[in-house]
Regions:
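PDZ-domain C-terminal substructure recognizer with occasional recognition of PDZ-binding tails
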Residues: 140-184
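Pan-zinc metallopeptidase signature
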Residues: 281-314
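Active-site His/Glu-centered metal-binding helix of metallohydrolases
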Residues: 223-233, 250, 254, 258
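Catalytic Zn2+-binding segment of zinc metalloproteases
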Residues: 210-219, 227-241, 263-264
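Active-site scaffold of zinc-dependent metalloenzymes
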Residues: 91-107, 123-125, 184-216, 234
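PDZ/PDZ-like peptide-tail recognition elements
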Residues: 39-102, 176-178, 189-192
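Short helix/loop segments within enzyme catalytic domains
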Residues: 33-72, 170, 239-289
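Conserved PDZ fold ligand-binding element
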Residues: 113-141
Length: 314
């Protein structure tokens, strides 16, 4: 999913800001000032959507029933041209084959959709006999098409299959997919060059700058896992700094357990904090709600490996 795709063009040159979980945004010297060529950004954005979708699937499975809300999930990322400016529609059709119908942007390996035969690039014609056009027309105001379709899947009764009517290479195909029920938190990708991740009570927002900074999916999983941990723990804003610091420490620890339970490498993931620390040359601007990157890294390394998976509710 993506939250802000109305901006035309997709920047790859990075002027990164340290805004991820506790560092004030500070513009870094432009190391690669050139933007991605106009005709390439949809392909790169689709790649990033797939990357986030794969990490989301694994972390939601690892969280299991620990999240306050669980929902049926089949492991797909959906996309629709309506989330983009009309002037970009011809480019989207030419580069990522997205035209009038919503499409499957990615399928998580090993997910119900993957095992049933759904593939990236499939056009979504209907869900359970209800046309995509009908679902789109009745969606609440302000809801993007991809979310409306995923919400339709999330309302599936336990044990019931979702019937996908798809078009692939001109042929209309039908797949019956039985969702799994697990953590309902979704990862939302938004276009921003800052290194940022934040959460509310339902979703985790990940910036494209964070994706560019995270060298591996292990690092990305630690960032996302930290934010999912805030949701699991029911953390809220507006508390004293000392209390908030305890929340952040707990989210670090639970986020590490989540990424381990999801099958990611803890040692590789923790390097995210190390690399953020190496860039934090103005540490005096760090929020009092967070300990130093060095202290946080040391605390994570001292934690025992995760043993109980999926993680248990607090």
């Amino acid at each position: 999913m993506i939250q802000d795709r109305k901006k035309s063009g997709f920047p790859a040159g990075l002027q990164l800001a340290l805004a991820f979980i506790g560092v004030a945004p500070l513009a870094l010297p432009a190391q690669a000032a050139t933007d991605v060529a106009r005709d390439v950004w949809p392909v790169l954005l689709r790649r990033d959507l797939a990357r986030v979708g794969h990490v989301e699937w694994r972390l939601r499975r690892a969280a299991g029933a620990a999240c306050p809300v669980q929902a049926p999930d089949v492991g797909v990322v959906l996309d629709d041209r309506g989330a983009y400016q009309k002037r970009d529609w011809p480019l989207l059709a030419a580069t990522v084959k997205m035209d009038e119908h919503p499409v499957v942007a990615s399928v998580a390996p090993g997910s119900p959709a993957d095992l049933a035969g759904v593939r990236a690039g499939d056009e979504v014609l209907a869900l359970d006999g209800v046309s995509a056009e009908t679902i789109i027309a009745r969606r609440p105001a302000g809801t993007v098409v991809a979310d409306a379709l995923l919400d339709e899947i999330a309302r599936t009764a336990p044990g019931k299959a979702v019937v996908f009517d798809l078009r692939r290479a001109g042929a209309v195909l039908q797949f019956s997919v039985v969702p799994v029920r697990h953590c309902a938190v979704r990862l939302v990708l938004f276009t921003d060059r800052s290194i940022e991740a934040h959460s509310d009570t339902r979703n985790v927002a990940i910036s494209t700058g964070m994706l560019a900074f995270a060298r591996t999916d292990d690092e990305l999983a630690l960032a996302a896992g930290h934010e999912i941990a805030h949701v699991i723990n029911g953390d809220r804003r507006g508390v004293p700094a000392k209390v908030r610091r305890g929340m952040e420490d707990a989210a670090d620890a639970l986020g590490l357990r989540l990424m381990e339970c999801a099958g990611y490498a803890r040692a590789t993931g923790i390097t995210l904090f190390e690399r953020l620390g190496s860039r934090d040359w103005l540490g005096f601007l760090r929020a009092r709600t967070h300990r130093s990157w060095k202290d946080r890294t040391q605390s994570l390394r001292a934690l025992p490996p995760a043993t109980a998976c999926p993680v248990a509710a607090p």
